Design a protein with these regions (language model features):
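Long alpha-helical scaffolds
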Residues: 4, 117-119, 164
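Conserved beta-strand segments that form the floor/walls of ligand-binding pockets within enzyme
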Residues: 6-8, 117, 145
Length: 171
């Protein structure tokens, strides 16, 4: 029987949420928005998975000031792209590390013949940046399902089901 380990990224491979929060704030500043997510607010916003979804939730549920008078379906992806750019730059500058023991766990799992994959709601660019800086790339992972590869984000199991399908493993 094939055995596999499927990793999430944020909070599993690495503690990234503070870096994500700061990247959102850089994106807001770069877009000329007066928004600032402090830690307390960001912890509330983490109830929603997905960066684009989190921005929409903030706008619709927290009386965001100075929301541009544009179609949010167009605006949010552009703003999120700025956030992704800020985040990947921060990761490339070494601001994010693997959690202790992760590198050894991956090495041991590979040595034992376990198959490895990633199932996450973060964007592919974020995953690529983290893996490039911390592990020298994605070669240890057979499958990476990230971002908008599924319609329903966590806690829905869709990204895990898709990962298992791509690995040829039963759910």
């Amino acid at each position: 029987m094939d055995r596999a380990i499927i990793f999430d990224v944020d909070g599993t491979l690495s503690e990234t949420e503070e870096t994500h929060r700061r990247a959102f704030n850089r994106a807001f500043q770069g877009a000329g928005l007066p928004w600032h997510w402090d830690r307390q607010l960001y912890n509330k916003l983490l109830a929603v998975t997905g960066g684009k979804e989190r921005i929409r939730y903030f706008i619709e549920s927290f009386d965001a000031p100075d929301v541009p008078a544009v179609d949010l379906d167009d605006f949010i992806p552009l703003l999120h792209a700025k956030k992704t750019g800020a985040y990947t730059e921060m990761v490339s500058n070494g601001e994010v590390e693997l959690r202790p023991g992760i590198r050894a766990l991956i090495k041991d799992a590979r040595a034992k013949g376990l198959r490895l994959a990633i199932a996450t709601t973060t964007t592919p660019a974020n995953v690529d940046a983290l893996l490039a800086v911390t592990l020298g790339g994605s070669r240890d992972f057979e499958v990476i399902c990230a971002g908008d590869s599924v319609a329903n984000k966590k806690p829905a199991p869709d990204v895990y089901v898709l990962t298992l399908e791509r690995m040829g493993l039963p759910a």
